[in-house]
Curated annotation (Swiss-Prot):
Segments passing through the bilayer: 10-30
Organism in which the protein naturally occurs: Cronobacter sakazakii (strain ATCC BAA-894)
Location in the cell: Cell inner membrane
Subunit structure: The system is composed of three essential subunits: KdpA, KdpB and KdpC.
Name of protein: Potassium-transporting ATPase KdpC subunit
Keywords noted in UniProt: ATP-binding, Cell inner membrane, Cell membrane, Ion transport, Membrane, Nucleotide-binding, Potassium, Potassium transport, Transmembrane, Transmembrane helix, Transport
Domain of life, per lineage: Bacteria
Gene Ontology molecular function, alphabetical: ATP binding; P-type potassium transmembrane transporter activity
Similarity comment: family membership: Belongs to the KdpC family.
GO terms for cellular component: plasma membrane
Length: 190
């Protein structure tokens, strides 16, 4: 019985600390130091939320750039069901999916030069990637330019403006934020 009181006191103390004080402190500090990130890194346009800087969206019209395919459950780009397809590289189902995506992209981008960039036909581990490489964006540029009736040079300028450099200049690779790029295209010509 003598051990019960300290054990219960410790239980109550740690419950209050880890279940109340710590979450409250991290929320307050997060809102204070990292307001944008704590609120989901949202992109707003005319006081309307268009999406998150960190979560991909489906774009299917020819006038928009397309991101990586989504492998999330239930619906594409579902942030509540993040995850890959878990198909092994040796799985014939993955090969069929990739071939179907290659054929669809080739049909939608008949003027594209070179091979279809691999990230446009394979889903990421999260299934929610927001960005593509500049090469994948430039590969789609002829289609977008033609659909919008603007020059490839203008589309290329927008791609370069919406390319984020690697962290510290050398960690990772340049990434084009597909949502921001498509919004820039709409601002140029809706």
């Amino acid at each position: 019985m003598a051990m019960l009181r300290p054990a219960l006191t410790l239980l109550v103390f740690l419950t209050i600390l880890t279940g109340g004080v710590y979450p409250l402190a991290t929320t307050v500090l997060g809102q204070w130091w990292f307001k944008d990130q704590a609120e989901g890194s949202l992109i707003r346009q005319h006081d309307e939320v268009r999406g998150s800087r960190l979560i991909g969206q489906a774009f299917s019209e020819a006038k928009y750039f397309q991101g990586r395919p989504s492998a999330t459950a239930e619906a594409p780009y579902n942030p509540m069901a993040s995850g890959g397809s878990n198909l092994a590289a040796s799985n014939p189902a993955l090969d069929k999916e990739v071939q179907a995506r290659v054929q669809a992209l080739r049909a939608a981008n008949p003027d594209a030069r070179a091979a279809v960039p691999v990230e446009l036909v394979t889903a990421s581990a999260s299934g929610l990637d927001y960005g593509i490489t500049p090469d994948a964006a430039f590969w789609q540029a002829p289609r977008v330019a033609q659909a919008r009736g603007i020059s490839e040079a203008e589309v290329g300028r927008l791609i370069r403006e919406n390319t984020d450099a690697p962290l510290a200049g050398f960690l990772g690779q340049p990434v084009v934020n597909v949502l921001k790029l498509n919004m820039a295209l709409d601002a140029l010509q809706p």
